[in-house]
Amino acid sequence: MKDIELGASVSFGCYFWRVLDIQSNLALIITEDIIEERPYHDAYKDITWVDCELRKYLNSEFYDSFNIADKRRIIPVINKNLDNQWYSSKGGVDTRDSIFLLSIEEACRYFGDSRSKLQNPGKNQKYWFERKDENNSKRIARPQGKEWASWWWLRSPGRVNVKAAYIHGDGNIGIQGNNILKGNIGDGKCIGGVRPALWLKIEE
């Protein structure tokens, strides 16, 4: 991984990852595929990233799936969790994360800046169905082993705090959000795609 480059696909742990950013000897990487499907939270209540079950899972059980050598290369960072700029729902406090989801702002930074096209004033503001842009294809992801695309979570809030933002199956940014818990946990309808991201120390 010495010759790591922006946009490259790299193997780390049990997954292939896309390199989104390089800063000094660190690389921001995100899984190429949707590696699993989970709810954002385990209860239908107002929540932000700091307290959601998906964050706890990524920084405990998922983090612990890496071996000791790999864990040493995963560098914790302080993440800014901004309010939803279209609906003013709260993003919550900054968090220290080893593993995390991208925010709306990071999705725009690394997969093409679509913020100007998200401006669709109106009661329903259904950008992802009404407006398409050239960056959609960059954000499309598929579950591992599947041929079709599916939607995946962002950590940012949706229009209210019982919803979290997401990337639609066609690559559009869902600024209104999906319910953090879609149905009951037992019925299998509460899940969304998970593409973990992390800052990785580049081997010398």
Protein language model features and the residues they cover:
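Collagenous Gly-X-Y triple-helix signature in extracellular proteins
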Residues: M1-E204
